[in-house]
Amino acid sequence: MHALQAKILDPRLGSEFPLPTYATPGSAGLDLRALLKEDTVLEPGQTLLIPTGLSIYIGDPGLAAVILPRSGLGHKHGIVLGNLVGLIDSDYQGELMVSCWNRSNTPFTIAVGERIAQLVLVPVVQAHFDIVEAFDESQRGAGGFGHSGSH
């Protein structure tokens, strides 16, 4: 298991609310919680930037983290990430914030301490560009957006 440096920015984290943990031994994501001042209603169509009370420092340029939605919130309540996926670079050290968007037609209350997203570490391969005049031909070529078939 990889060790991450973390700072607790909200004293409720680790006392009133548990630190991010894996729910099961096979879980890929650490649950992030809404460290709001009070329960907050997210109106239909509204987005809100929610603090997690935590900052991390990955430090390894071969790793990054992504913030992903929790499937139950999206499927059952229409609460998804406002930016779809949050990317945390290895050199970022600020608070982890979660952009939540209510895509439903119903107001949704985000409770203080509620699990709102998950953090997943991913490997990173950095690349540089080799400028060429033409590519070697491939079967697909420049075909995209449904080019490989409709079903």
UniProtKB/Swiss-Prot annotation:
The keyword Magnesium applies. Gene3D superfamilies: 2.70.40.10. The lineage of its organism: Bacteria, Pseudomonadati, Pseudomonadota, Gammaproteobacteria, Pseudomonadales. GO terms for molecular function: dUTP diphosphatase activity; magnesium ion binding. Keywords: Hydrolase, Magnesium, Metal-binding, Nucleotide metabolism. Its EC number is 3.6.1.23. InterPro entries: dUTPase (IPR008181), dUTPase-like (IPR029054), dUTPase-like_sf (IPR036157), dUTPase_trimeric (IPR033704). Pathway: Pyrimidine metabolism; dUMP biosynthesis; dUMP from dCTP (dUTP route): step 2/2. It catalyses: dUTP + H2O = dUMP + diphosphate + H(+). Belongs to the dUTPase family. This enzyme is involved in nucleotide metabolism: it produces dUMP, the immediate precursor of thymidine nucleotides and it decreases the intracellular concentration of dUTP so that uracil cannot be incorporated into DNA. It comes from the Bacteria. Its cofactor is Mg(2+). GO terms for biological process: dUMP biosynthetic process; dUTP catabolic process. The gene is dut. Substrate binds at R70, S71, G72, N83, L87, I88, D89, M97. PANTHER family: DEOXYURIDINE 5'-TRIPHOSPHATE NUCLEOTIDOHYDROLASE. It holds the Pfam family dUTPase. This is Deoxyuridine 5'-triphosphate nucleotidohydrolase.
